[in-house]
Amino acid sequence: MFSGFSSFGGGNGFVNMPQTFEEFFRCYPIAMMNDRIRKDDANFGGKIFLPPSALSKLSMLNIRYPMLFKLTANETGRVTHGGVLEFIAEEGRVYLPQWMMETLGIQPGSLLQISSTDVPLGQFVKLEPQSVDFLDISDPKAVLENVLRNFSTLTVDDVIEISYNGKTFKIKILEVKPESSSKSICVIETDLVTDFAPPVGYVEPDYKALKAQQDKEKKNSFGKGQVLDPSVLGQGSMSTRIDYAGIANSSRNKLSKFVGQGQNISGKAPKAEPKQDIKDMKITFDGEPAKLDLPEGQLFFGFPMVLPKEDEESAAGSKSSEQNFQGQGISLRKSNKRKTKSDHDSSKSKAPKSPEVIEID
C-alpha cells in the first residue's frame, strides 16, 4: 500500500528531512532582561534570545547550522531576519535588540511570529550611515569588519546600530547581493564586499570655490601680521623682491670718485659695458652701508658671504702640528755588524796635541 514511499532513504523508510520551526512569542527589548543574564552588548548585533524549549524543538526538527530566523510582526506587517545568541529567555518570551524593535515597529509585549529560514551567503552590501558623525571614523571598513561579527543576517531597509568609541551609529542597509525574495543575506563565514553611500545630511563641498576663497584670504592677509606666501603674490626669492642687484650696484658707485661717461673723438657711441653678475661682484665694506628699504612684513637676514681660504703655509703648519708621536727608535741589543772605517777612531784623534803657543811681551 505504501510501496510508493520506498524510494525515500534508499528503500529503508523515511529519513529525517529538515522541517520548519514556527512559533509565536511575546517580544521584549534586551534592556528588560534579568540583570543576571542581560548582555547590553547584544543591542549592537543582530541576534535574539529564545527560551530553552525552542532549542529542543529546533534539535528535533533537524534545523541546520547556522540557525537563521524570519521575524514577522503581524501588527505592522514588517519583516526582518536574524540569528540566535543564546537560549536563556523565559518561556513564551523572546528578547530583541532595540534597533530590531524599532524596525518592526512593535512595542514591548507585542506578539511576534518567529520561523526558521534559509538565506543565501552574502557577497555585497551597500550601507548608508544615518549621520555625518560616521565620517569621524578613520577606518570605517575595519570597524565594520569587527562589528559585523555580531550579526547573522543583513536585510534591506533595516537600520542597524553599531557602537564605536562609546558612540552609537545607525546604518541603513540599501542593497544586498545576491538578490532573493527575502531581500536578506547571511554574513557568517563569507567574504563580503562593502560599499558606502554618502551619509544622511552630507553635502559635497565645492573645492574650486573653496580654493579661490583661500587664495583671496591669503592675499588680504598681507600686512596684517599673518604669514605671507610669496607664491600667492607672484613674487620670487628675497633677493628679487628687495632688488639686491640694484642696491649692491648703487653702493659700489658711491665708492668710485670718478664716475662719469666717456666720449669718443670719432663721435661713435661708446660700447655699453656688460652687466656684471651678482656672483662675480666684489663687495667692499669700506664705504657707507647702503640704505635697505624693505616692504612691510619682510625680513632681511644679511648678504651672502664667502669665507676666505686658508694660506698654504698655515695649512702646512697645521698639518705638521697634527703629526703626533715623532721620534727615533733605539735598539737595546748591540749590533753584531763589523765596524766600518767611519766607526773606528781615527789615529789623528788619538795623537797627542801640540802645546799651545803663548806669546809674552
From Swiss-Prot:
Which segments show compositional bias classed as Polar residues?
317-329
Gene Ontology CC annotations of this record: cytosol; Doa10p ubiquitin ligase complex; Hrd1p ubiquitin ligase ERAD-L complex; nucleus; replisome; RQC complex; VCP-NPL4-UFD1 AAA ATPase complex
- Phenotypic consequence of residue 94 to D: In UFD1-1; grows more slowly
The record's section on Gene3D superfamilies has:
3.10.330.10, Ubiquitin fusion degradation protein UFD1, N-terminal domain
- Annotated region Disordered: where? 310-361
**What's in the keyword line of the UniProt record?**
Phosphoprotein, Ubl conjugation pathway
Q: In UniProt terms, what function does this protein have? A: Functions at a post-ubiquitation step in the ubiquitin fusion degradation (UFD) pathway. Has a role in the endoplasmic reticulum-associated degradation (ERAD) pathway. Required for the proteasome-dependent processing/activation of MGA2 and SPT23 transcription factors leading to the subsequent expression of OLE1. Has an additional role in the turnover of OLE1 where it targets ubiquitinated OLE1 and other proteins to the ERAD.
Q: In the record, which positions carry Phosphoserine?
A: 354
Gene Ontology biological process terms in this record:
cytoplasm protein quality control by the ubiquitin-proteasome system; DNA replication termination; ERAD pathway; mitochondria-associated ubiquitin-dependent protein catabolic process; nonfunctional rRNA decay; positive regulation of protein localization to nucleus; proteasome-mediated ubiquitin-dependent protein catabolic process; protein localization to vacuole
The source organism is Saccharomyces cerevisiae (strain ATCC 204508 / S288c)
Q: What else is known?
A: Present with 3530 molecules/cell in log phase SD medium.
Q: What is this protein called?
A: Ubiquitin fusion degradation protein 1
Q: Which family does it belong to?
A: Belongs to the UFD1 family.
What does the annotation say about its assembly with partners?
Answer: Component of the heterotrimeric CDC48-NPL4-UFD1 ATPase complex. The CDC48-NPL4-UFD1 ATPase complex interacts with the HRD1 ubiquitin ligase complex composed of the E3 ligase HRD1, its cofactors HRD3, USA1 and DER1, substrate recruiting factor YOS9 and CDC48-binding protein UBX2. Interaction between the complexes is mediated by interaction between CDC48-NPL4-UFD1 complex member CDC48 and HRD1 complex member UBX2. Forms a complex composed of CDC48, NPL4, UFD1, DOA1, SHP1 and deubiquitinase OTU1. Interacts with NPL4, CDC48 and UBX2.
Annotated spans, Monoubiquitin-binding: 27-28, 30-32, 99-101
Q: Which residues cross the membrane?
A: none
The answer to whether keyword Phosphoprotein applies is yes
Q: Where is this site: Monoubiquitin-binding?
A: 37, 39, 109
A Pfam family recorded for this sequence: UFD1_N1
Q: What GO molecular functions are on record for this protein?
A: polyubiquitin modification-dependent protein binding; ubiquitin binding
